[in-house]
């Protein structure tokens, strides 16, 4: 149980936290000024310190180097006492466990920083073994260049030791590199240490500058985490050092570790500006849900369309032309890099309306392969009487032809030169001649069911609403879902493209065959939010931002999770669920 560290915001594994000392420290941060080391037990026996609320006290410890044998670790393990002051325990990834501390220092960090695979494996093992609501500390490894990646991986606290040491060795550090002092004609910084001519700049000044640069970079990182856009930043930062590039890619390979920490909804823009953007959890998750959860419910032909720069697609000039040509006679699905395929019902769902990519007209082979794989999986799951490709010649048509050949499908192409030319629009209209129209009501019902599929699981839309006579009020995209008894079940949230349930809707969800995400609470009636100490249990597959049913002996509620399932159970501080509706039992 931690009393002195609390997480306030999350962006994947990165977190904004509070080290609750007399003067609180917002993390991620440098900890030099508030860290008190009680000493190593290798040198001598140590008395348990009195501790203080002013500092984070590292309890007496035995640090072991990276690669120490298991029997050595066991022989020299330390029994950490329970204390009533802010404390940190020293561990390795192998020995990491809940010792009742507020923070944990990885003693062998200097042995694996610089080695991407070892860093990834050690940090992930430590994060999986330590309590979710404690701080992770890495000492002697942080620089302005690498600290954003350290935070991205889940590190909360660092120190200035390496940055200052490099300065005393004659190196001037920046967020994108390092320079020999003698190579600097001018100082590319305006911090207090740099307010002198380069000719008068000493190694001691460099140490001060490096510490200032590290603190400034951490401030930038904290802002990015608050905005939910740290990933956008580290995609660029990783380019400044080969091991950081390797580390970045290694963490992308750990989908499970990252996915359980990445929110399912955000209102911030997702910038897809590099090849690695395809590997983002948000993009992989969307593609996975579209091809495993979503199911087309229209009986009409499929029309494949290009994406548009404007989001949502339906509000773009080109897609309005396509809609006028289609006239409710076909199911429209957009193809895009790096998202994959976007059925019209999910065009508002994060990240389909939130991403922005570099538009050059040229697709890399990786982009083509990814979109082709998503389209192939989509067409394997969804049957259509006809497939019409209203796509510009080039990458789009290459992808469709590749998939059509693999699946032995017939595809009708309708574009001459460009999708919005008069000739191309006319071709699309004529190709759909004689096809029956679906109604606006049918479209709206299918939107609601598709959102339920995407949010909750395969066929959830039918499980929730097949036995309910749905009535829609308001117009798309602000749909409200009512049953035939005049009781509201849910509302579509245009900002995120998800369903927000009422209490009655939550009961329908709970009693249906759709997978239910449930948070079990203690015997109280929550008002506004459920704090983590009140959580008794929670489904492991809950992600931050998920719609969740909250049940306890005295209350039934519906709300949105602020933490993942594991964190809900393990945390002793912080808001676990934001409650929307509640009733007493």
Swiss-Prot record:
Lineage: superkingdom: Archaea
Subunit organization: Homodimer.
Protein name: Archaeosine synthase
GO cellular component: cytoplasm
Catalyses which reaction(s): 7-cyano-7-carbaguanosine(15) in tRNA + L-glutamine + H2O = archaeosine(15) in tRNA + L-glutamate
Gene name of this polypeptide: arcS
SMART domains: PUA (SM00359)
Entry's Gene Ontology molecular function annotations: archaeosine synthase activity; RNA binding
Keywords, alphabetical: Transferase, tRNA processing
Stored PROSITE patterns: PUA
InterPro entries cross-referenced by the UniProt entry: Archaeosine_synthase_1, ArchSynthase1/Queuine_TRR, DUF5591, PUA, PUA-like_sf, PUA_sf, TGT-like_sf, TGT_C2
Residue ranges of every copy of the PUA domain listed in the record: 516-584
Record EC number: 2.6.1.97
Family stated for the protein in its record: Belongs to the archaeosine synthase type 1 family.
Species this protein is from: Haloferax volcanii (strain ATCC 29605 / DSM 3757 / JCM 8879 / NBRC 14742 / NCIMB 2012 / VKM B-1768 / DS2) (Halobacterium volcanii)
Known pathway: tRNA modification; archaeosine-tRNA biosynthesis
GO terms classed as biological process: tRNA wobble guanine modification
Task performed by this protein: Is responsible for the final step in the biosynthesis of archaeosine, a modified nucleoside present in the dihydrouridine loop (D-loop) of archaeal tRNA. Catalyzes the conversion of 7-cyano-7-deazaguanine (preQ0)-modified tRNA to archaeosine-tRNA, transforming a nitrile group to a formamidine group.
Mutant phenotype after disruption: Cells lacking this gene lack archaeosine in tRNA and accumulate preQ0-modified tRNA.
């Amino acid at each position: 149980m931690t009393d002195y560290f609390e997480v306030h915001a999350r962006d994947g594994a990165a977190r904004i936290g509070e080290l609750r000392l007399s003067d609180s420290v917002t993390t991620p941060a440098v900890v030099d000024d508030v860290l008190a080391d009680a000493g190593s037990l290798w040198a001598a026996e140590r008395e348990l310190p009195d501790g203080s609320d002013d500092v984070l006290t590292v309890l007496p410890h035995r640090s072991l180097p990276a690669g120490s044998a298991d029997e050595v670790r066991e022989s020299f393990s330390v029994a950490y006492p329970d204390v009533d002051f802010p404390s940190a325990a020293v561990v390795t990834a192998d020995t990491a466990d809940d010792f009742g501390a507020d923070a944990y220092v990885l003693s062998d960090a200097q042995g694996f920083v610089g080695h991407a695979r070892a860093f990834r494996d050690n940090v992930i093992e430590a994060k999986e073994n330590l309590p979710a609501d404690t701080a992770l500390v890495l000492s002697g490894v942080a620089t302005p260049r690498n600290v954003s990646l350290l935070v991205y991986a889940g590190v909360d606290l660092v120190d200035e030791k390496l940055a200052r040491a490099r300065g005393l060795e004659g190196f001037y550090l920046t967020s994108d590199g390092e320079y020999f002092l003698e190579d600097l004609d001018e100082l590319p910084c305006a911090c207090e240490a740099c307010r002198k001519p380069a000719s008068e700049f000493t190694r001691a000044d460099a140490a001060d500058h490096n510490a200032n640069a590290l603190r400034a970079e951490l401030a930038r990182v904290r802002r990015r985490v608050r905005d939910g856009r740290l990933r956008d930043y580290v995609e660029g930062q990783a380019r400044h050092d080969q091991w950081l590039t390797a580390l970045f890619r290694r963490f992308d390979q750990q989908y499970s570790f990252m996915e359980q920490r990445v929110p399912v909804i955000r209102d911030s823009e997702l910038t897809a500006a590099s090849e690695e953007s395809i590997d983002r959890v948000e993009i992989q998750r969307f593609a996975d849900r579209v091809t495993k959860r979503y199911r087309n419910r229209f009986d009409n032909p499929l029309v494949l369309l290009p994406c548009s720069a404007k989001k949502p697609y339906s509000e773009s000039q080109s897609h309005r032309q396509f809609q006028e040509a289609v006239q409710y006679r076909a199911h429209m699905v957009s193809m895009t890099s790096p998202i994959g395929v976007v059925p019209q019902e999910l065009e508002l769902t994060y990240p389909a309306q939130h991403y922005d990519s570099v538009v050059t007209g040229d697709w890399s082979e990786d982009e083509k392969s990814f979109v082709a794989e998503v389209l192939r999986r989509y067409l394997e799951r969804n049957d259509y009487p006809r497939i019409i490709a209203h796509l510009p010649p080039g990458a789009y048509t290459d992808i469709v032809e590749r998939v059509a050949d693999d699946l032995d499908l017939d595809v009708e192409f309708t574009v001459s030169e460009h999708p919005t030319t008069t000739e191309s629009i006319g071709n699309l209209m004529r190709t759909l001649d004689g096809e029956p129209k679906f109604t606006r009501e049918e479209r709206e019902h299918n939107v609601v069911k598709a959102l339920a599929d995407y949010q909750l699981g395969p066929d959830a839309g039918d499980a929730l609403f097949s036995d309910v006579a749905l009535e829609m009020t308001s117009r798309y995209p602000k749909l409200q879902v009512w049953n035939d008894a005049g009781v509201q079940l849910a509302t579509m949230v245009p900002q995120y493209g998800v369903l927000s349930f009422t209490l009655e809707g939550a009961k329908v969800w709970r009693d249906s065959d759709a997978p239910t995400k449930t948070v079990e609470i203690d015997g109280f009636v929550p008002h506004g939010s459920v704090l983590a100490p009140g959580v008794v249990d929670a489904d492991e597959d809950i992600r931050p931002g998920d719609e969740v049913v909250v049940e306890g002996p005295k209350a039934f509620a519906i709300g949105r999770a602020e933490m993942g399932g594991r964190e809900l159970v393990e945390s002793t501080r912080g808001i676990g669920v934001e409650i929307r509706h509640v009733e007493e039992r």
